[in-house]
């Protein structure tokens, strides 16, 4: 991809877990549309999303999202990113409806009609007044996906979105991703071990298994 057309540019990214290197001088350009990050369980997919979300600090390298360089303006960078780790316990005590109601203040391009559509499509209305700790794995991911798609964030990061989903929800998810991927100013980065049917993947980033 021509760097001039990339929404996200990553240069020389380096990161290690204690005693275990994960990325060494890794570079990539991500444009508008859907990008698949694929690899096995130990390939660093989730770690990469956390690095792109500025949740983990790299030991070297730079990230530029639009005109914003993470190292120069970390808060401005993070305001352009949607990332919610489905495995994190940090949201357990929150009520779904209250969490969703707080998101428009964080995302300037928040799309309320889109959220309403996704709440219907994922059949989430019975769960809006529950705490996140009460949600099944699949329902939790559906809530996060509805918010991610409605966020309007230039960089939207999603980790293993189909875990725990039934077939109808997977079909809806794939159609919603395909529709959202048409936006000319959004990069949807999805980490999964294989491509999802019906999603027009603009690019595929394959991560090797870590030794």
What are these regions (language model features)?
Residues 1-32:
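A short, flexible loop at the N-terminus of ABC-type nucleotide-binding domains that lies
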Residues 53:
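Helix-to-loop junction immediately C-terminal to a conserved catalytic motif
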Residues 58-72, 76-77:
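Conserved ABC transporter NBD signature motif
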Residues 87-109, 114:
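Q-loop/switch helix immediately C-terminal to the Walker
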Residues 112-128:
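Conserved ABC ATPase "signature" region
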Residues 145:
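Hydrophobic anchor residue at the start of the ABC signature
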Residues 160-161:
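Walker B catalytic motif
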């Amino acid at each position: 991809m021509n760097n001039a057309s990339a929404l996200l540019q990553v240069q020389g990214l380096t990161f290690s877990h204690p005693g275990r290197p994960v990325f060494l001088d890794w570079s990539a350009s991500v444009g508008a549309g859907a990008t698949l990050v694929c690899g096995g369980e130990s390939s660093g997919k989730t770690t990469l999303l956390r690095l792109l979300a500025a949740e983990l600090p790299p030991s070297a390298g730079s990230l530029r999202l639009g005109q914003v360089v993470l190292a120069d303006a970390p808060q401005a960078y993070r305001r352009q990113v949607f990332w919610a780790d489905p495995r994190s316990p940090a949201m357990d005590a929150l009520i779904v409806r209250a969490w969703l109601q707080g998101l428009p203040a964080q995302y300037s391009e928040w799309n309320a009609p889109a959220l309403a559509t996704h709440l219907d499509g994922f059949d989430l209305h019975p769960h809006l007044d529950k705490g996140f700790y009460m949600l099944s794995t699949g329902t939790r991911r559906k809530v996060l996906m509805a918010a991610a798609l409605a966020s309007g964030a230039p960089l939207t990061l999603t980790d293993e979105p189909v875990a725990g989903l039934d077939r109808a929800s997977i079909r809806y998810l794939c159609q919603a991703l395909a529709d959202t991927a048409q936006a000319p100013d959004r990069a949807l980065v999805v980490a999964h071990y294989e491509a999802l049917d019906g999603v027009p993947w603009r690019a595929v980033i394959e991560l090797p298994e870590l030794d």
